[in-house]
């Protein structure tokens, strides 16, 4: 089963366990969010929404928030000694699609426990520097 969802003005075709990079949305890392604008459900019997499918949502887990690649906008006017350079980086949220839900069902998968960070082990060179 697949779904076509709309978020941030763009449309995505998703199946469970897909990983998406979309424009930044609210939600802490590890939480499950629901994307409600489902335009189409596909599978054995496809359902088209007018404009959205009633009662259908897509559950997704927030994997991380990050910044996209730098985009540079450079404009130059020849022979005028005039140029303008600007750059920006988009804020991105990385999602993993967990479930495609129809008929107003609630997601069955809860949020995953946060990852434990590995303890930092001091090397002998760092310990010698600290002792000196």
UniProtKB/Swiss-Prot annotation:
A Gene Ontology term for the protein's cellular component: ribosome
Keywords: Ribonucleoprotein, Ribosomal protein, RNA-binding, rRNA-binding
GO molecular function list: rRNA binding; structural constituent of ribosome
Biological process, per Gene Ontology: translation
Top-rank lineage group of the source organism: Bacteria
Region: Disordered, residue numbers: 104-132
Keyword Iron-sulfur: no
Protein family (similarity comment): Belongs to the bacterial ribosomal protein bL21 family.
Subunit structure: Part of the 50S ribosomal subunit. Contacts protein L20.
PANTHER family: 50S RIBOSOMAL PROTEIN L21 (PTHR21349), LARGE RIBOSOMAL SUBUNIT PROTEIN BL21M (PTHR21349:SF0)
Annotated function: This protein binds to 23S rRNA in the presence of protein L20.
Name this polypeptide is given: Large ribosomal subunit protein bL21
Species name: Rhodopseudomonas palustris (strain BisB18)
């Amino acid at each position: 089963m697949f779904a076509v969802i709309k978020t941030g003005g763009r449309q995505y075709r998703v199946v469970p366990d897909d990983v998406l990079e979309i424009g930044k949305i609210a939600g802490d890392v590890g939480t499950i969010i629901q994307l409600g604008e489902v335009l189409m459900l596909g599978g054995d019997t496809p359902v088209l929404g007018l404009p959205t499918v009633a009662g259908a949502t897509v559950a997704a887990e927030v994997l991380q928030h990050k910044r996209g690649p730098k985009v540079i906008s450079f404009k130059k006017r020849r022979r005028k000694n005039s140029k303008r350079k600007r750059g920006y980086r988009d804020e991105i949220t990385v999602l993993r699609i967990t479930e495609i839900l129809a008929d107003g069902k609630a997601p069955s998968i809860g949020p995953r426990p946060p990852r434990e960070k590995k303890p930092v082990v001091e090397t002998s060179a760092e310990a010698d520097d600290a002792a000196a």
